[in-house]
Regions:
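C-terminal lobe and pocket-closing loops
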Residues: 28, 128, 142, 212-280, ...
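An extracytoplasmic/periplasmic, membrane-proximal ligand-sensing/linker region
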Residues: 28, 34-36, 264-325
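Short hydrophobic/charged patches on amphipathic alpha-helices used for structural packing
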Residues: 82, 145-148, 194, 213
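A ligand-binding cleft/hinge motif common to bilobed small-molecule-binding domains
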Residues: 102-111, 168, 172-177, 204-237
Length: 325
């Protein structure tokens, strides 16, 4: 049977398309990854998010035999980078370095370009770091009880330095739970905030251990308590807030997320590989150097944690009368 030229072309194209589809089908989740993986960090280089993303990314790349590229996309309280991942293909090749700010933004931002629950899956938890309550030389207190007593005796006397975002939330949470009236002064970063505390222009701060550690070493500020459930190995002599008489607990966590709909085999592969990385003594030492600890969770456990934290930080914002912008 003779075929027309047009019919022959159609059949040839159909055959090629079928072959391409078959080839694509063979490169499913079982072959993941078959190309480089991109991890978007929604903050500038140099912070804890960037530090941990680069370390884990480097280790993961070695284990998988594929390059893991770190792509910093700062801006708009992390929403630019976060939205990029929310709208990416759910194939495991675009990941998001996520932290506690992810669950705090919905409490203070009226309209997010993404849904924090519906638009994301969670392949891996990385770790957690504590906050530290620190004071400068201008505040005549030696422990947490004295700080709270001073705050109650002198309403609006104490100035809390904050870099906004996570630091603002944990500061507002401390102020509310301590039952004191204190002014929260906003700075353009943790460094200028702590510099002002050392200079006596602000009195105290509630910040991550990663942020305050260099300043504690200088001896110009002192730690009164930590916000973790147990004492920190890097500050063994500093009590927890609960030990010091205030049931205050706050921490920053880090995890990797992907666009919703990422196949379970890919999520599970990433979860398994990263869990093995987190178990390594050298990884735990790297986290400890930033005053943090590794934490391993399954994808479903991370999602439940995110849901619970959304409720928690929304309550903190409402109690502190933080306005949505």
């Amino acid at each position: 049977m003779k075929l027309s030229l047009a019919t022959s072309v159609v059949l040839l194209l159909a055959s090629a398309a079928g072959a391409h589809a078959a080839e694509k089908a063979t490169k499913g989740p079982g072959d993941y990854p078959s190309r480089p993986i991109r991890v978007i960090v929604p903050q500038a280089p140099g912070g804890s998010n960037d530090i941990f993303a680069r370390y884990i990314g480097g280790q993961l790349g070695e284990r998988l035999g594929k390059t893991v590229v770190i792509d910093n996309r700062p801006g708009a309280e992390g929403m630019i980078g976060t939205d990029t991942v929310a709208k990416a293909a759910p194939d495991g090749y675009t990941l998001l370095m996520t932290s506690t700010a992810f669950v705090q933004n919905p409490a203070v931002i009226k309209k997010l370009p993404y849904d924090p629950i519906k638009d994301f899956d969670w392949p891996a938890m990385l770790g957690r770091g504590s906050v530290v309550i620190v004071v400068g030389p201008s505040l005549p207190v030696n422990n947490l009880k004295e700080l709270v007593a001073l705050g109650k005796a002198k309403p609006n006397y104490i100035t809390m330095a904050s870099a906004g975002g996570f630091m603002h939330f944990v500061s507002a949470m401390f102020r509310s739970q301590a039952g004191i009236d204190a002014t929260i002064a906003l700075y353009k970063g943790g460094a200028p905030a702590l510099t002002d505390i050392m200079g006596g222009h602000a009195h105290m701060a509630v910040a991550t251990m990663v942020t305050v550690n260099p300043y504690l070493k200088s001896g110009k500020i002192k730690a009164l308590a930590v916000g973790s459930p147990k004492r920190l190995s890097v500050l063994p002599d500093i009590p927890t807030a609960a030990e010091a008489g205030l049931p205050y607990e706050a921490s920053i966590w880090w995890a990797w997320s992907t666009a919703a709909g990422t196949p379970a085999p890919i999520l599970n592969k990433l979860n398994t590989e990263i869990a093995e990385i987190l178990k390594l003594p050298e990884t735990q030492k790297r986290f400890a150097a930033e005053a943090a600890e590794v934490e391993i969770k399954k994808p479903a456990e991370i999602k439940e944690m995110v849901k619970a934290d959304l409720v928690k930080w929304d309550k903190v914002a409402r109690d502190a009368k933080m306005q949505k912008q």
